[in-house]
Amino acid sequence: MQEVKAFNEKRAEIYWWFSSLFAKELTENELETYHSVEIRSFLAGLGENESLKPAVDTLVDALNRLQDREDAQLELAADFCELFLKTEKHGALPYASMYIGKSGLLNDKPAEEMEKLMADFGMQVDENLKEPADHLAVELDFLGNMIIRSNELEQEKHMEEALEKQNEFIQQHLMTWLPQFAAKCKQFDEFGFYVSVAQLLIAFCKLDSTYLLGE
């Protein structure tokens, strides 16, 4: 159990890291940390897994190119804005409703389902984010909390049930629309930083599901 709990902490941290990248633009200081030994070592560690390596390599390449990009922070913030804050026609809006909702509008059934799931879990959307519950950053943050909450369990049977629920969440609330979202990122993200993050997220979700299913 202790090994599982230690691994859960790492999994939660990774989902929270992804969440932070889709929640808001990176500041100058945050961007600097992406060139630090700590973050590069973290990415290298992820890249040691064969299924993650191609996506990690693409992300590292984007980070290396950022170092040569003039006004890198401003340009990356502009990329974030164009992709995630503008229109569905020219961007990749990070809401499940835009991809699997019936209306093609915000706050469709996926947002309602997430709100209920969060309420059942005793959570609500962070007021600072001011986004619907099916925003990608909210869903990833929630998954991180699900994982950490399961570390309070003491019986192996209960932990197995919790891991099954985590896999269900990944399959039903993320993998149902992440591939379409990543495809739109690829279409509109010319520089390629955010599409590389989206592709790495998908690769990680698939890997995590394999782990959760005990394959």
UniProtKB/Swiss-Prot annotation:
A GO biological process of this protein is: protein complex oligomerization
The cellular location(s) given in this protein's UniProt record come to:
Cytoplasm
> Is Chaperone given among the entry's keywords?
yes
Q: Report the superkingdom from the record.
A: Bacteria
Gene3D superfamilies per record: 1.20.120.1820, HscB, C-terminal domain (1.20.1280.20)
Keyword Chaperone listed:
yes
Q: Which UniProt keywords apply?
A: Chaperone, Cytoplasm
Q: Which InterPro entries match?
A: Chaperone_TorD, DMSO/NO3_reduct_chaperone, HscB_C_sf, TorD-like_sf, TorD/DmsD_chaperones
Q: Name one GO cellular component term.
A: cytoplasm
PANTHER family linked: CHAPERONE PROTEIN TORD (PTHR34227:SF11), CHAPERONE PROTEIN YCDY (PTHR34227)
Function as written in the Swiss-Prot or TrEMBL entry: Involved in the biogenesis of TorA. Acts on TorA before the insertion of the molybdenum cofactor and, as a result, probably favors a conformation of the apoenzyme that is competent for acquiring the cofactor.
Identify its protein family: Belongs to the TorD/DmsD family. TorD subfamily.
Q: Which NCBIfam families match?
A: PRK04976.1 (NF003442)
HAMAP family tied to this protein: TorD (MF_01150)
From the Swiss-Prot or TrEMBL record, give the protein name.
Chaperone protein TorD
